[in-house]
Amino acid sequence: MRSSVPPVAWRVRSWPLAVLIALAPLWLIGILDRGLWTPDEPREADIAWRMSQQTDRLLPQLAGKPFLEKPPLSYWLSASGIRAFGQPRAPNIVYATVTALSVGATAAAMTDAGAAFLSALLVGTLLMAFRVSVWLAPDACLLAGCALALAGAYRGYTSAPGRRKLGGYTLMHLGAAIGFMAKSAPGWLVPALALLTLIAWERKWSELLRIELYAGLVVQALIIGPWMYAVAVSPGGHEALSTLFWHNIVGRFTRIPGPAALDYTSGHHNWPGKYFLELPVYLLPWTLLAVAALERAWRGVRITGPSGTPWRFAIAATLPFLVILSLAATARDVYAAPAMLGMSLLIALWARESQNKLTALDRFALRGTRALVAAIACVFAAFLSLLALADRLNYQPIDHLEEGIRIAAAAATIIVAAVALRFASRAQRLSNVRGAVVCTFGAYAGALCIAGIAAFPAVDQWQNLTQLADNIHYETRDEPLALLDPDETTIAMLDYRLRTPSSVLDTTGSDAAHVVSGWFRLHGKRSRVLVLLPGHAPGGVTRFLSRFHTIPPPGDGVAGTLATEGTASIVRRFELPQGRRYALLGPPPS
């Protein structure tokens, strides 16, 4: 018997399942089917591993020393992932799911199930949102908390006074608390800016007097309060809280007095307009759709009454946060990830409004996006072909099966993208905007999944810091080891599951030769100093490319200078193909 449930009702109930089915391959491959990659992941893995070993889990630790840049929620969860599955990125599956479904729920409240499905696909594939969701860092948990908070804020704002409004705002506070415990102030800033901007825009000042808006603060107090109290009463707790919430927040906007290690204005420099100029890259492959959405939003935000509220909320969830980021002294692209939530909603609203009534700009955006996805698929295929050719120049036995897989994957990438894009073109001819976007998503996601499965093993070899750390650990097992001006990745890789004993030599304000020679005098002829060398080691890819363009070999940096001056000798080198290079220094020959 044919079901009596109307098709629209069926879609409303089933869009979350459809989202999970569509995005699961991207999440599983991007999160679980690769090793730990720089930047940041080796450091985050060591902090999570340390958290899984700690008896006092109040504060994160990097190589046994307090790491006071973020609150501990994401590290608690990653430590649980290590204990349960041996995988610190396992919680990212939950973060990505919460992010996609929360954005979808917001779009469903704005319009319909079709917008919910589309917005979830978009936030799952926008370059910056996808990168953050699959990366081992607190930003993934922050993004999930912000998505949850925005969903609650919209529901609370648009609901009539009573239980539904209370539930919405309570959800907002829950998401804000999760975001705060993941990465401090941005967890509060994103929903607060969106809601306050919307209230001011619509001059609905009475909303600030609603008891429902503040009742959920109890949730935040119950989540954040016990942890902050426990830290405050612990030894050195007040200094830890000052570092977490003064130097790490205010100190990223302006230079404040304090130790040099806490001067965050000295790295990741910001410059005027950085985030807005880089925004087209963050939005790939949907950049042109975002342009069309912004053009339509110009009219949408001027619609009076509830019909214009979705447009105003999407803008309020995006632009104010980017403006605040632009005022900071420090900047990193991942900081802008929460702004992708509002952009996903904006594009979904555009797709609904342009359905069956395309403008010239809409048509150009759809065609241009298909061309962009086709170009990306070609780049993926070219990269896979390059890997297959480069394998022959790695000075290792050729794995013909792996070579064949990469060539076949390159062909499959092109075929899958071409077929899906053809369906997208047909949907546009029928003025089916949502269908065109979904088919384009299929082309992009299919190409990314196929290329990822084939390419990630090669990238894992370039990023195999575990092997590098094992070799260094074995080579220095009976020798005093020092690290010369190490970065956090070096410290983390030697500590992760190995606890390689070492000391840090800091040359700030000193001469490297004086510091290193002093270490050798103090610890004898068997002592060693590890130095990160500049550039990357050669590999099959660089050897292949050097046939067409001369690639100068990287120098030895400070290690070469110390060896030339007779302060030290290079005892051994450690390197990964296309990856990091290290020199192990010993005392100069007698």
What annotation goes with each model-predicted range?
Residues 2-4, 13, 170, 296-590:
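Membrane-embedded architecture of ER/inner-membrane glycosylation machinery
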Residues 2-363, 576-581:
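Membrane-integral, polyisoprenol-dependent glycosyltransferases
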